[in-house]
Amino acid sequence: MDIVFIKELCIETVIGIYDWERKIKQFVCIDLELGTDISSASNSDVIDDTVDYKAVSKTLKSFIGDSEFQLIEALAEESVKLIFEKFNVNYIKGRFSKPGAVTGSKEVGVIIERYRDSA
Protein backbone atom coordinates (compact mmCIF):
# COMPACT_ATOMS: atom_id res chain seq x y z
CA MET A 1 0.00 0.00 0.00
CA ASP A 2 1.18 3.50 -0.83
CA ILE A 3 0.47 6.67 1.12
CA VAL A 4 -0.73 10.03 -0.17
CA PHE A 5 -0.39 12.56 2.64
CA ILE A 6 -1.61 16.00 3.63
CA LYS A 7 0.19 17.80 6.46
CA GLU A 8 -0.98 20.73 8.59
CA LEU A 9 -4.24 21.51 6.82
CA CYS A 10 -5.76 24.10 9.18
CA ILE A 11 -9.45 24.97 8.90
CA GLU A 12 -11.51 27.49 10.87
CA THR A 13 -14.68 26.08 12.38
CA VAL A 14 -16.97 26.19 15.39
CA ILE A 15 -15.84 23.45 17.75
CA GLY A 16 -15.96 22.92 21.49
CA ILE A 17 -18.18 22.16 24.45
CA TYR A 18 -18.08 25.52 26.21
CA ASP A 19 -20.57 28.32 25.55
CA TRP A 20 -17.81 30.73 24.53
CA GLU A 21 -16.50 28.19 21.99
CA ARG A 22 -19.91 27.98 20.34
CA LYS A 23 -19.73 31.72 19.55
CA ILE A 24 -16.34 31.82 17.81
CA LYS A 25 -14.37 30.02 15.14
CA GLN A 26 -11.21 28.15 16.08
CA PHE A 27 -8.64 26.34 13.99
CA VAL A 28 -8.60 22.58 13.64
CA CYS A 29 -5.37 21.28 12.09
CA ILE A 30 -5.20 17.97 10.28
CA ASP A 31 -2.49 15.59 9.13
CA LEU A 32 -3.69 12.74 6.92
CA GLU A 33 -2.16 9.58 5.55
CA LEU A 34 -4.34 8.09 2.82
CA GLY A 35 -3.58 4.50 1.86
CA THR A 36 -4.04 3.69 -1.81
CA ASP A 37 -2.26 2.13 -4.77
CA ILE A 38 -0.41 4.77 -6.78
CA SER A 39 1.06 2.40 -9.38
CA SER A 40 -1.47 3.39 -12.08
CA ALA A 41 -0.77 7.08 -11.54
CA SER A 42 2.98 6.55 -11.53
CA ASN A 43 2.68 4.85 -14.92
CA SER A 44 0.10 7.17 -16.50
CA ASP A 45 1.07 10.51 -14.92
CA VAL A 46 -2.68 11.31 -14.81
CA ILE A 47 -4.33 12.81 -11.71
CA ASP A 48 -7.50 10.73 -12.16
CA ASP A 49 -5.43 7.61 -11.44
CA THR A 50 -4.57 8.65 -7.88
CA VAL A 51 -6.03 10.37 -4.84
CA ASP A 52 -6.23 14.08 -5.62
CA TYR A 53 -5.01 15.69 -2.40
CA LYS A 54 -6.32 19.07 -3.53
CA ALA A 55 -9.82 17.59 -3.90
CA VAL A 56 -9.53 15.91 -0.48
CA SER A 57 -8.44 19.21 1.07
CA LYS A 58 -11.26 21.13 -0.61
CA THR A 59 -13.81 18.56 0.59
CA LEU A 60 -12.56 18.80 4.17
CA LYS A 61 -12.38 22.61 4.12
CA SER A 62 -16.02 22.77 3.06
CA PHE A 63 -17.26 20.05 5.43
CA ILE A 64 -15.33 21.12 8.52
CA GLY A 65 -15.68 24.84 7.84
CA ASP A 66 -19.48 24.50 7.82
CA SER A 67 -19.66 22.09 10.78
CA GLU A 68 -20.32 22.80 14.45
CA PHE A 69 -19.08 19.72 16.29
CA GLN A 70 -18.62 19.78 20.03
CA LEU A 71 -15.90 17.13 20.17
CA ILE A 72 -12.79 16.74 18.04
CA GLU A 73 -13.45 12.98 18.22
CA ALA A 74 -16.75 13.37 16.37
CA LEU A 75 -15.24 15.76 13.84
CA ALA A 76 -12.42 13.29 13.15
CA GLU A 77 -14.71 10.28 12.72
CA GLU A 78 -17.14 12.06 10.41
CA SER A 79 -14.29 13.52 8.34
CA VAL A 80 -12.79 10.07 7.82
CA LYS A 81 -16.19 8.64 6.84
CA LEU A 82 -16.57 11.41 4.27
CA ILE A 83 -13.15 10.70 2.75
CA PHE A 84 -14.01 7.00 2.43
CA GLU A 85 -17.30 7.91 0.73
CA LYS A 86 -15.77 10.27 -1.82
CA PHE A 87 -12.29 8.93 -2.54
CA ASN A 88 -10.64 5.66 -3.49
CA VAL A 89 -8.63 5.01 -0.34
CA ASN A 90 -8.44 1.83 1.73
CA TYR A 91 -6.79 3.24 4.85
CA ILE A 92 -6.76 6.57 6.65
CA LYS A 93 -4.63 7.73 9.54
CA GLY A 94 -5.74 11.14 10.69
CA ARG A 95 -4.33 13.48 13.31
CA PHE A 96 -6.90 16.13 14.27
CA SER A 97 -5.83 18.85 16.70
CA LYS A 98 -6.96 22.10 18.29
CA PRO A 99 -3.97 24.42 18.62
CA GLY A 100 -3.90 26.41 21.86
CA ALA A 101 -6.94 24.68 23.35
CA VAL A 102 -5.21 23.94 26.64
CA THR A 103 -3.09 26.54 28.42
CA GLY A 104 0.54 25.50 28.38
CA SER A 105 0.07 23.05 25.51
CA LYS A 106 0.81 23.72 21.86
CA GLU A 107 -2.11 21.56 20.74
CA VAL A 108 -4.42 18.74 21.81
CA GLY A 109 -6.40 16.29 19.75
CA VAL A 110 -6.86 12.74 18.53
CA ILE A 111 -5.20 10.34 16.14
CA ILE A 112 -7.45 7.78 14.48
CA GLU A 113 -6.74 4.94 12.07
CA ARG A 114 -9.45 3.36 9.99
CA TYR A 115 -9.60 0.80 7.20
CA ARG A 116 -12.32 0.91 4.57
CA ASP A 117 -13.92 -2.28 5.93
CA SER A 118 -14.37 -0.72 9.40
CA ALA A 119 -15.46 2.77 8.34
What are these regions (language model features)?
Residues 1-119:
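N-terminal, polar/charged subdomain of small-to-medium soluble alpha/beta proteins
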